[in-house]
Structure formats: C-alpha cells, structure tokens
C-alpha cells in the first residue's frame, strides 16, 4: 500500500473522532488515548473505508508488481498510477512489456489502417470500487518501432443486466 496524503488525513480524522467519542465515556485521558490508538485502524478499515468506497471511487494505491498484475487482474487499477507517473513502460520493447504485463487482452482500433493494430495493446484494469461505478478502467499502450511510445488510460461503460 502506498501511503498518500489522503490516507494519512483520513486516518487522522478517524483518530480524532474516535478519541472524542471515547473521551465521552470516561475522563482518563491516557486510557482514552490508548483505546483510540487501538480503535483507529479497526474503525478505519471496518467502517470509514467501506463507507468511503460506497459513495466515492477512492481506492488505495499499490506499488507495481508484475506477479500481482498477472495474478490479480481485478486489482490492476491500484497499480496503474505508479506505472503512469514513473513512465515505467516508456521505451520498453514488446517482449519486455509482455514479460511484465502478459499478453495484451485485445488490440486497439487504428483509424489509419481501419483495422485492429498490433501496435495498440490494451489491458483491462478492472472496476474501481464504488456503488455507483459502472466504468471499466483500461490501459492502452501505443508502440512505435516495437517500443512503447505512449500510454493512456480510458474508461468503458459496462451495462449490468
């Protein structure tokens, strides 16, 4: 898990709320502090974070790991931010990308040749958490001379029946 500003701020908010609530039970400030420290992670991961996921598309970020990318495709959206920010794939060959990400799931449409192109690789990133999210996240790699020249993310709307 990548420690972000949002994660730290939300932990602080949960800690303050837990401390204020526990302080109403008794006046012993050291006991209230100790119980608040113990209760904060429990309250965060069992109450605050699930409620946050229901109403927003906030999610934790993870460091990119090639094994996790291939083993847990539904969690790829957590790793793609690091790939984009650090340009980890720019300049890599098709063989190197295939070794890290696996075979492309589909080829993108190229308007210039009016067909699917072997130079536009697409990967499904899964759905970000949220009760009202029907957007599937996707990653497209654009190759020039068999090396990655650009990458972009986009969303596909899925209809659930």
What residues fall within each predicted segment?
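Residues within mature, well-folded domains
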Residues: 2-161
